[in-house]
Structures are given as structure tokens and as C-alpha cells.
Amino acid sequence: MKRPRPTSQPSISSTVKPPLSPPVTPILKQKLHRTGTPKWFPLKLTHTELTLPLTFPTGQTFRWKKTGAIQYSGTIGPHLVSLRQRPGDDAVSYCVHCSTSPKSAELALLDFLNAEISLAELWSDFSKKDPRFGELARHLRGARVLRQDPLECLIQFLCSSNNNIARITKMVDFVSSLGLHLGDIDGFEFHQFPSLDRLSRVSEEEFRKAGFGYRAKYITGTVNALQAKPGGGNEWLLSLRKVELQEAVAALCTLPGVGPKVAACIALFSLDQHSAIPVDTHVWQIATNYLLPDLAGAKLTPKLHGRVAEAFVSKYGEYAGWAQTLLFIAELPAQKTLLQSFSQPINKLDESAEVNETSCDTLKP
């Protein structure tokens, strides 16, 4: 499903914390409006279409923070927003803390959440194809795939290489701090993601001093490569929403530090490539257990990445990436406790079992 991107918001630079070099004075093309007492409004998504703990802390994005019992806050362009769910409330609520326009913030939020895609319809389709998926979905409703800004998603997953979630989050927080400060919530600072121009003024050495290690050269190399693209790097990334998955992945893999797995993550979480399947050793193990038993015991090679992705697409169709996202979430420790209460065991299920366990583990736990 390919959709046009809403009109882009202006890039805004900001003050940078030492030891990074100071940016130029930011120029705001639109006035930011900050609210006083938070006002909450119902979002056009029920809890069965969006469950916050099954969407945000699951490895899709590392820029959203838990700021309440069931509340998450983050930025989308120049908009600082919060989402919350309360026991007994069917609808998810949202609050705009800072924005160029409250109406624009709502539209940007719905776009970010892929709100036009019905989980109920997808889950019904997947369950018909795989009854075991239906059992998982019954317990893990509301796990959505996000539609992030491609540059933001790309930089985040460059930080994810051979890394753990805590360290990735620290790196992403550092990159985010290069953008305009939009506000503080529950002790967390929130910034608009920095522009390509702002990122280009940070050297590899400065990223290394900030603890990025070898990833520093990938970030600076990718930023330079994007800036050299005819028409601009942001436009080039957005153009990958309009091409076939193979072409998008191949294009992303020309960037420093981007391999097939990272490219698939970026494609799935920001480029409308809903059939993208990030493949690593964890996904390989699950695939050989349940989808490709003839390859059990074989070593994962670049050539076999395609076979794994094809197996998921063959099973679940053009939105296979959404199915794999839920199956990955089922692997998270917080969810395993719930799933172990099922009448059917989770591990080593045969073809007649009603519950399946599959992983889209793009990160080290």
C-alpha cells in the first residue's frame, strides 16, 4: 500500500551539547505553539487497533519514552505529543504539547501510526492462513507497525548494528539532542530530529567521542552519501516508498553500514514496504523450525536471506512484515509470561498446534 507523504515540515537546527561544535542560529519558518495544561483528545484508534506497550517499546523506534502508567511521548517532525490508554477506555487519547499546528499534529500522528491500515482486517486474514497466529493475536492485539520518517529510521538502525536496546537508545538520544528542543515531559527531553544539514556538521571523531564506536563512520558516511544525491537525500529516501521492495533494499544497501537486515527494517518501518522481513540468526532459527524445516541445521548465508523472506510472504502475503512484527513481540520476555499461560505450549509446536512462535529479532536482547 503506497500513499503520498504529507507536506514535509521545515528542518530546524538547535543548540548542541559539548563536545560537539555549535550550530548556526536556528531559523524557524513556522511558529511553535506550546500548551500549558495538557488537553487530551480521543484518537481515531481503539485499543484493539493500537496497544501502546505492544507498539513503542518493541524495537521499531528508540525515540519514544514511557511517561506514564500506559503513556508514551515522542516527537513527529515539529510536534511533541503524548499517547495514553486508561483502563476501561476503549479509545486511545492523545495530547499535543508543542506544535506548529494542533491539527497538523493530529494528522502527522495518524500518519505515523499507519492509521489507515486496519489491524482487525489484517489479523483476520493472517488467522485464516495460520490458526496459530490467530491465538497469538487474540492475546496480543493492537501491535502496529509504525510509519516513521525515513531519515530518522535510517539513523536509528545504523545505531542498532550489533548493539543492545539500552545502548541504542543512548546513541539515538544523543543524535536527537542535535535538533530543536521542543519540551520536557516526566524528566525526559524531547527534540525534533536533526536535519541532514545539521548532521553533516558533526564529524566522525565527535561521534566516536560520544561513544558510537565504528558506527560513527557509518553515520557520517551515510549522511555525506545522502547529501550527494541529486535532488537531496530526503527526497531520495522518500522516493523508495514508490518502488518495489527489492529495489528499495538494494538502494539502501549502497549506503555505508546498511546491510540486508538493516535495510529491511528501514523498509518496513518507514518506506511502506509491508512485506519486508528483517532476517538475522534468530529469525533464521524460527524459520527453519516452522517454515523451512528442510533447511534445519544449515548455516544462514546471504543467499538464504531471500528464501526466509519468501517463506514469510508465502505464508502471510503482502503484509507479511506486520505478521512478523507481532510474532517478534510474542518473543519478548514481557509477553512470554502471558503466552506461557496458554493451554498449548509455546515452544516446539507441530503443524497441528494452535499457537506459533516466530521472531523478527532485529536487535540483541
Swiss-Prot record:
<protein>
    <recommendedName>
        <fullName>N-glycosylase/DNA lyase OGG1</fullName>
        <ecNumber>3.2.2.-</ecNumber>
        <ecNumber>4.2.99.18</ecNumber>
    </recommendedName>
</protein>
<dbReference type="InterPro" id="IPR012904">
    <property type="entry name" value="OGG_N"/>
</dbReference>
<comment type="similarity">
    <text>Belongs to the type-1 OGG1 family.</text>
</comment>
<keyword id="KW-0234">DNA repair</keyword>
<feature type="binding site">
    <location>
        <position position="280"/>
    </location>
    <ligand>
        <name>8-oxoguanine</name>
    </ligand>
</feature>
<dbReference type="GO" id="GO:0006284">
    <property type="term" value="P:base-excision repair"/>
</dbReference>
<keyword id="KW-0378">Hydrolase</keyword>
<dbReference type="InterPro" id="IPR023170">
    <property type="entry name" value="HhH_base_excis_C"/>
</dbReference>
<feature type="binding site">
    <location>
        <position position="278"/>
    </location>
    <ligand>
        <name>8-oxoguanine</name>
    </ligand>
</feature>
<keyword id="KW-0326">Glycosidase</keyword>
<dbReference type="GO" id="GO:0006289">
    <property type="term" value="P:nucleotide-excision repair"/>
</dbReference>
<feature type="region of interest" description="Disordered">
    <location>
        <begin position="1"/>
        <end position="24"/>
    </location>
</feature>
<comment type="function">
    <text>Involved in repair of DNA damaged by oxidation by incising DNA at 8-oxoG residues. Excises 7,8-dihydro-8-oxoguanine and 2,6-diamino-4-hydroxy-5-N-methylformamidopyrimidine (Fapy) from damaged DNA. Has a beta-lyase activity that nicks DNA 3' to the lesion.</text>
</comment>
<feature type="active site" description="Schiff-base intermediate with DNA">
    <location>
        <position position="261"/>
    </location>
</feature>
<dbReference type="InterPro" id="IPR011257">
    <property type="entry name" value="DNA_glycosylase"/>
</dbReference>
<keyword id="KW-0238">DNA-binding</keyword>
<dbReference type="GO" id="GO:0003684">
    <property type="term" value="F:damaged DNA binding"/>
</dbReference>
<keyword id="KW-0539">Nucleus</keyword>
<feature type="binding site">
    <location>
        <position position="282"/>
    </location>
    <ligand>
        <name>DNA</name>
    </ligand>
</feature>
<dbReference type="InterPro" id="IPR003265">
    <property type="entry name" value="HhH-GPD_domain"/>
</dbReference>
<dbReference type="GO" id="GO:0006281">
    <property type="term" value="P:DNA repair"/>
</dbReference>
<keyword id="KW-0456">Lyase</keyword>
<dbReference type="GO" id="GO:0140078">
    <property type="term" value="F:class I DNA-(apurinic or apyrimidinic site) endonuclease activity"/>
</dbReference>
<keyword id="KW-0227">DNA damage</keyword>
<feature type="compositionally biased region" description="Polar residues">
    <location>
        <begin position="1"/>
        <end position="16"/>
    </location>
</feature>
<keyword id="KW-0511">Multifunctional enzyme</keyword>
<feature type="binding site">
    <location>
        <position position="162"/>
    </location>
    <ligand>
        <name>DNA</name>
    </ligand>
</feature>
<feature type="binding site">
    <location>
        <position position="215"/>
    </location>
    <ligand>
        <name>DNA</name>
    </ligand>
</feature>
<feature type="binding site">
    <location>
        <position position="328"/>
    </location>
    <ligand>
        <name>8-oxoguanine</name>
    </ligand>
</feature>
<dbReference type="Pfam" id="PF00730">
    <property type="entry name" value="HhH-GPD"/>
</dbReference>
<feature type="binding site">
    <location>
        <position position="324"/>
    </location>
    <ligand>
        <name>8-oxoguanine</name>
    </ligand>
</feature>
<dbReference type="GO" id="GO:0008534">
    <property type="term" value="F:oxidized purine nucleobase lesion DNA N-glycosylase activity"/>
</dbReference>
<dbReference type="Pfam" id="PF07934">
    <property type="entry name" value="OGG_N"/>
</dbReference>
<dbReference type="GO" id="GO:0005634">
    <property type="term" value="C:nucleus"/>
</dbReference>
<feature type="binding site">
    <location>
        <position position="167"/>
    </location>
    <ligand>
        <name>DNA</name>
    </ligand>
</feature>
<dbReference type="InterPro" id="IPR052054">
    <property type="entry name" value="Oxidative_DNA_repair_enzyme"/>
</dbReference>
